[in-house]
């Protein structure tokens, strides 16, 4: 399974759990926000945003020279 499929399964599971336990939507958002997956997604998003901001501010970096071919 790819990451998108797992994310959809996670959200559907959280919706079902939240619906069974309570009818308040705020508690569901708290659970999602505090979950490990959400923390990983936020940190990945922050890193991508920082990289993008650095590229915009500093201009595109020159690409490193291609590595020499490996001998077999």
UniProtKB/Swiss-Prot annotation:
List the GO cellular component terms. extracellular region
Q: Which residues form the propeptide?
A: 70-72
Q: Which UniProt keywords apply?
A: Antibiotic, Antimicrobial, Cleavage on pair of basic residues, Fungicide, Hypotensive agent, Metalloenzyme inhibitor, Metalloprotease inhibitor, Protease inhibitor, Secreted, Signal, Toxin
> Which Gene Ontology terms describe the biological processes this protein takes part in?
defense response to bacterium; defense response to fungus; killing of cells of another organism; regulation of blood pressure
Q: State its location(s).
A: Secreted
Job of this protein: Amphipathic peptide that shows bradykinin potentiating activity and antimicrobial activities against bacteria and fungi. Has higher antibacterial activities against Gram-negative than against Gram-positive bacteria. Also inhibits NADPH oxidase-dependent superoxide production (IC(50) is 0.4 uM on granulocytes stimulated with PMA, IC(50) is 0.51 uM on HL-60 cells undifferentiated and IC(50) is 0.53 uM on HL-60 cells treated with DMSO). The C-terminal peptide shows a higher bradykinin potentiating activity than the complete peptide.
Other remarks on this protein:
Shows a very weak hemolytic activity (6 uM causes only 3.5 % of hemolysis).
Q: What is stated as this protein's family in its record?
A: Belongs to the non-disulfide-bridged peptide (NDBP) superfamily. Long chain multifunctional peptide (group 2) family.
Q: What is this protein called?
A: Bradykinin-potentiating peptide BmKbpp
